[in-house]
């Protein structure tokens, strides 16, 4: 059906128009009025959030542009979380960017504008129902992120990180595109629904399909940062400005999760046994190498990079534990648990990098674990918030990270893969060491600098709400879990 129904695309159209308008406005702003670009960017995200939330509450699935674009419960919920993630990133980053002259002078408001273009790419990825639309969204997001990583053109470390990210990112895009070309050659269609239908008939070349699947999974693993396609993650996290690291480590994970569902679960359900085996290997390797390597790190950004790799292993556990069109609740347990996990992980990561930027100041980067020494003496409240963040990453109750891990483990056990659940628990216990080491440093070590921490009101309030949200979701995880499960079920049923 060739339809040009623009209603499902209203959030994307608004964001694209607003971003272009902000870009033009920023050209005429003096440095003293650059704050307006920041405010307009946040306002744009708020409007987009209202639009996507209203679509989510409607619960309907609608298509546009000849079924190439879909607005469904999963995409709308993930978009809403993306707006929150990027909005928090902008709030946490504002003072950090101003201290380093990154939002004035010749750079202007480019950080905010590139951030909005990143969001646009993620939105397109989440709503893509066509191979080429997925690739289009991926490139919009990736090109914006490449520019953000290289934002500090006078910083050799940042430029090196940008080069690594660009080269490996281009390689990942090539893998994904080559895999898509194989799938297109085997099925004769770029439409995800049609690809699934053709494969289900059995009238396809199975070796070509498997060959294409391998490249698609490799490309997705690059974007997620799963082992053995994780080489870029530690160097880019450490080398990029902390504000950019947060932009990299937050919302893009939501988009990567979305296209994984689109490509594997929606387009290739007939090959579930094959890609679930691949994800099992990626998951175990990611949890093993991520957790073990993180123990040896003294740079907290690098430690969080390896932590991200291990957390991706848990997300993959949920994805490989879902049963396509299962009537026994396994779909809910697997894909819903993975979605719940990635949302809560992103929320936790935002807060942690927010604390790092809070401790940083002009001419000083709080990149090392030693910079957290005695934080409880300098600011008991921020130390407590960091404690909640670390407990969530480690999976310590009653913070939400515990229930996210528990939901994934329950999904794994429901499929009978007891050995996989045992491996996940063992590596989680190993991972708890380096998270709790930061807590020990904050509460039991003496600070090198005993000056009290002074934070702006917006950062103080936002970081406090972030920490409180993790605790509240841990005490009452039901509503978000139910929303994730319902979104997945409705999306896969449509």
From Swiss-Prot:
- Give GO BP annotations, semicolon-separated: ATP synthesis coupled electron transport
- Compartments, as annotated in UniProt: Cell inner membrane
Which Pfam families has this protein been placed in?
Proton_antipo_M
Concerning InterPro entries, the annotation shows:
NADH-Q_OxRdtase_suN/2 (IPR010096), ND/Mrp_TM (IPR001750)
Q: Name one GO molecular function term.
A: NADH dehydrogenase (ubiquinone) activity
One GO CC term of this entry? plasma membrane
Keywords, in A-Z order: Cell inner membrane, Cell membrane, Membrane, NAD, Quinone, Translocase, Transmembrane, Transmembrane helix, Transport, Ubiquinone
Q: Which reaction does it catalyse?
A: a quinone + NADH + 5 H(+)(in) = a quinol + NAD(+) + 4 H(+)(out)
Q: What superkingdom heads the lineage?
A: Bacteria
The EC number of this protein is 7.1.1.-
For membrane topology, the record states: Multi-pass membrane protein
What role does this protein play?
Answer: NDH-1 shuttles electrons from NADH, via FMN and iron-sulfur (Fe-S) centers, to quinones in the respiratory chain. The immediate electron acceptor for the enzyme in this species is believed to be ubiquinone. Couples the redox reaction to proton translocation (for every two electrons transferred, four hydrogen ions are translocated across the cytoplasmic membrane), and thus conserves the redox energy in a proton gradient.
Which NCBIfam families does the UniProt entry name for this protein?
A: NDH_I_N, PRK05777.1-5
Q: Could you tell me which PANTHER family the record lists for this protein? A: NADH DEHYDROGENASE (PTHR22773)
Q: Which family does it belong to?
A: Belongs to the complex I subunit 2 family.
Report the protein name in the record: NADH-quinone oxidoreductase subunit N
